[in-house]
UniProtKB/Swiss-Prot annotation:
One of its GO terms (cellular component) is cytosol. Its cofactor is Zn(2+). It comes from Bacillus cereus (strain ATCC 10987 / NRS 248). This is Cysteine--tRNA ligase. HAMAP family: Cys_tRNA_synth (MF_00041). Zn(2+) binds at residues 29, 209, 234, 238.
Length: 465
């Protein structure tokens, strides 16, 4: 089974054929570290971490690079407002970013380059573009000469005439063409700066990724990915810079994830309708947030609501409960049944269907459907009069493998005896107060944790299922 990826560049699904056999070079645009990330910012790390995990599962050696923009207009503004320097703020939010995405199940990239640690190669990249006539200096700023790059607009599928019609030169800009964009910005008084052939300043946003991708992955990479909002102008400009310099294809497959909406409106810091990751993971299990995100195909928008999150949690708990039941039954199973082959063959079908979903442009939504199928099938098997450790181990291993591919964990902390007794006492009090809704909720919650209650004349008894 081959993997097919929807390529934004061609607007169609294409068979994935890496440049080097069994190796994948992948670059994912990382955050500008001036604040905590919101759940919209967190979608790309989760999506493309899952892509990476699946590629590794299929046997590829993945070189995964994701950068930090640690100097930028937003960082300078934050520094001025807080009375701190830019490096202090950047360091704080790099650490916060790692805490958030690690909680969400994301592995660290092979390399997490920072702009400020790669200034030499960025300046060198700009100088090479100037030398080739693709860039020009203007009063300390350096701009990319867009009209010199023939393919400009090919990623966003916009004719250059249309782009030029909608572009304008802002006050203070010294560029020759409205479509030209900054590679280097002259420092204003009091701003952080680096020395360069054009004077003191700092790089523009777009050049940073081109330079770091080239340094760590080479002139041509397999997959370049990021949020949908980066396709234009950021990724369009990356293509122009990189291909103008090298004369080679910059990235062969372009992947972009959809937005997260709140009440059908794009989540963003500028609109003020965002939910910070470090806040929501205090309220909900981070694994649930990831499961929720992956329940929708990565190219589709997600409309976030607590109702949808709760519904997703119910589904996740069903799978975890099935897994817990399998683990408990493993101790008491025998090998008396002779129907092992049928159940194992069905498991193989679920595995195949899961991989078919992931091979189809990493369709995690359909892949998760197969997780539900495995869990439901396991529950049916556990109703058999005799069960086999061979089959149960196969169910357990399959669920663990598929969850690991998606960056999820199945382990559920077992309730202590004292915790169970405390919940039973709370249920008894609820029944005395005729709060039958609470009583039923406690019973159902315990059942989900594989604790069976039995109400008798002598009181409530319990056992582990």
């Amino acid at each position: 089974m081959t993997i097919h990826i929807y390529n934004t560049l061609t607007r169609q699904k294409e068979e994935f054929i890496p440049l080097e056999e069994n190796k994948v070079k992948m670059y994912v645009c990382g955050p500008t570290v001036y604040n905590y990330i919101h759940i919209g910012n967190a979608r790309p790390p989760m999506v493309f971490d899952t892509v990476r995990r699946y590629l590794e599962y299929k046997g590829y050696d993945v070189q995964y690079v994701s950068n930090f923009t640690d100097v930028d207009d937003k960082l300078i503004k934050a520094a001025n407002e807080l009375g701190e320097d830019v490096p202090t703020i950047a360091d704080r939010f790099v650490e916060a970013y790692f805490e958030d995405v690690t909680a969400l199940g994301c592995k660290h990239a092979t390399v997490h380059p920072r702009v400020t640690e790669n200034m030499d190669i960025i300046i060198e990249f700009i100088q090479e573009l100037v030398n080739k006539g693709y860039a020009y200096e203007s009063e300390g700023d350096v701009y990319f000469r867009t009209k010199e790059f023939e393919g400009y607009g090919k990623l966003s599928h916009q004719p250059i005439a249309d782009l030029r019609h909608g572009a304008r030169i802002e006050v203070g800009e010294k560029k020759q063409d409205p479509l030209d964009f900054a590679l280097w910005k002259a420092a204003k008084e009091g701003e952080i700066f680096w020395e360069s052939p054009w004077g003191q300043g700092r790089p523009g946003w777009h050049i940073e990724c081109s330079a770091m991708a080239r340094k760590y992955l080479g002139d041509t990479i397999d997959i370049h990915a990021g949020g949908q909002d980066l396709a234009f102008p950021h990724h369009e400009n990356e293509i122009a810079q990189s291909e103008a310099l090298t004369g080679k294809t910059f990235a062969r497959y372009w992947m972009h994830n959809g937005y997260i909406n709140i009440n059908n409106e794009k989540m963003s810091k500028s609109l003020g309708n965002f939910i910070l990751v470090h806040d929501i993971i205090k309220q909900y299990d981070p694994q649930l947030i990831r499961f929720f995100m992956l329940s929708v195909h990565y190219r589709h928008p997600i409309n976030f609501s607590e109702e949808l999150l709760q519904s997703t949690n119910n589904g996740l708990e069903r799978i975890k409960t099935a897994y817990g039941n399998l683990k408990h039954r493993m101790e008491s199973s025998t090998d008396l049944t002779d129907h092992n082959e049928k159940w194992l063959a069905d498991l193989e079908k679920f595995q195949t269907a899961f991989e078919e979903a992931m091979n189809d442009d990493f369709n995690t939504a359909n892949a998760i459907t197969e997780l539900y199928n495995v869990a439901n099938h396991a529950n049916q098997y556990l109703l058999e009069e005799h069960t086999s450790t061979v089959v149960i181990q196969a169910y357990v291993k399959q669920l663990e493998t598929l969850f690991d591919i998606l960056g999820l964990e199945l382990a559920q902390e077992e309730l202590l005896d004292e915790e169970i007794e405390a919940l039973i006492q709370k249920r008894i009090e609820a029944r005395k107060n005729r709060d039958f809704a609470l009583s039923d909720q406690i019973r159902d919650d315990l059942k989900d944790r594989n604790i069976i209650l039995e109400d008798t004349a002598q009181g409530t008894r319990w056992k582990r299922g």
